[in-house]
Amino acid sequence: MKLLLFGYGNVGKAFRKLLHEKRSPELNDVIIGGIVTRRGIMLQDKEDFTPDLEGDVFKAFEKIKPDIIVDVSSANYNNGEPSLSLYKEAIKDGVNIITTNKAPLALAFNEIFSLARSKGVKIGFQGTVMSGTPSINLYRVLPGSRVIKIRGILNGTTNFILTLMNKGVSFEEALKEAQRRGYAEEDPTLDINGFDAAAKITILANFMIGNSVTIKDVKFEGINRDLPKNEKIKLIAYADEKEVWVKPLPISQDDPLYNVDGVENALEITTDIQSILIRGPGAGPVNAAYGALSDLILLKRDCL
């Protein structure tokens, strides 16, 4: 079974490493047929990227003819490209997809999955929400239950900043510390303004509740220096059948999300049967890569 790896940054390199290290029986026949980045196309599987051909991901798709696309490329929230068009082309050819790229799903979840169902194509996307912590794949093992609402802390950067602010650190100093530790980007806008969490709750709302929403339908607020100082604040993402939103809210000590601190993420899923809480690391290249690898194994087991 041949993979086309789209993207070879930290997540792509971590995925390749895990694929070689975690040789479960399901992975014995899996090979990386090629890797494509902005620099070109490598038609082999090796640690150091050296392009063999010029060209983009569409040329790589045509040349390599993969069985599965693994998309670990960076997100383009303007229009989801080139991943969105790549997914459509892959689905039409019956090629399965594994992705850690939130943008196409946040912009066109139902369009993508409707097309995939019509062609019998499987899509694994655990790495888009909470990385390797099985938020998406937890839902796959809840057959027969109906999700009524979901709420959670879905952005590790803002949760780390809010944890420090709760200890009396200023917003500016907390952000600097997050950047120093590598939790926040040099430009942290998409984390700080709530957009990243909004993209994730969009994916969850469509997948778990059956909503028909895009990131453009979600109301979101971020965090700033003006948040109340005398209460513990968390950036909460919420969805039910009627609304999807993200905003900072005070949280009480008896709330299951109260002690979710640092870069940890958590998701509370309320069904018509029970309420389930899952928590764990929500970021980091190895965690995201493991999310993709777990999807690959589940795909091989015919469990996606």
UniProtKB/Swiss-Prot annotation:
Homodimer. Pfam families: Homoserine_dh, NAD_binding_3. NAD(+) binds at residues 11, 73, 284. It is an enzyme of class 1 (oxidoreductase). The gene is hom. Inhibited by cysteine. This is Homoserine dehydrogenase. InterPro entries: Asp/hSer_DH_NAD-bd, HDH_cat, HDH_CS, HDH_short, NAD(P)-bd_dom_sf.
